[in-house]
Amino acid sequence: MIPGPATLPDLLDRLHVVALPMRVRFRGITTREVALIEGPSGWGEFGAFLEYQPPEAAAWLASAIDAAYGQPPPVRRGRIPINATVPAVPPAQVPELLARFPGARTAKVKVAEPGQTLASDVERVNAVRALVPTVRVDANGGWSVDQAAQAAVALTADGPLEYLEQPCATVGELAELRRRIEVPIAADEAIRKAEDPLAVVRAGAADVAVLKVAPLGGVWALLDIAAQIDIPVVISSALDSAVGIAAGLSAAAALPQLQHACGLGTGGLFVEDVAEPAIPVDGALAPQRVVPDPARLRALGAAPDRRQWWIDRIKACYPLLYRRSGD
């Protein structure tokens, strides 16, 4: 169920649309637009990527409503270890990026991006490995099974990997690859973009489940899925602002078990954010409520045409939400 009352006029009255400049290109963008909802229970973030159509983006709106109108789950831990995130940058930029994640002992490195070669991926991973003891890579489904098997060999020639995140696009490919290689496999898109988020686990196609609050419909929806998964869970952001990061930390703090560092340190990828970014202490963040700074909201406000674009998007997604919930 979607928390209420969250009528469409009420949502739009509480809306702030911001454009956050990024330090480096990530997912092909240099500015991250998100819509924030100032609700009676707190702040929610609707940041479905621009190319997502309403049927997929609606879950992200559900997450924003959940945060703005609902109540957070009980906190089980006050410290969430995080990983550094390294985009597809030249090796020379790696030290500067890692410095934004003080104390992090795990790093996730983007690989298999358009225009990048396996050789450049290996160089980037090795540059990270020289500075951080635990390395995982994220291919965003960019490889075939054969390419992923080849990459697994190349990327582990100079040291181990914690896991390969979404090396191939489909559940069938992940299952086949898992039979062929020894490197653990984590599923991300195969969970958050699937009609059945549990299919990849039932197929024995992953060793780790990467769960993201917004695409799964909110903190409570994520925790419900996590309770049905019998493999370790990693909570990660979807290039969220400080508001979305707070929701991710809330989810991570509520899990019964947390075996791996979480991908919730991505606030360091922004030049400016809507609130003062949380600084990791000894590689960890504490769950806490985030209230955007009014001055930052004004300074980072999106252009009028972009604000209207997000209003139209919410209008398109909202009916899909409540149809799904049975209201």
From Swiss-Prot:
Pfam families: Enolase_like_N (PF18374), MR_MLE_C (PF13378)
Positions of the catalytic residues: 110, 212
Cofactor: a divalent metal cation
Keyword vocabulary terms for this entry: Lyase, Magnesium, Menaquinone biosynthesis, Metal-binding
Binding locations of Mg(2+): 138, 165, 188
Family matches, as SMART domains: MR_MLE (SM00922)
EC number(s) from the headed UniProt entry: 4.2.1.113
Family listed: Belongs to the mandelate racemase/muconate lactonizing enzyme family. MenC type 1 subfamily.
Protein name: o-succinylbenzoate synthase
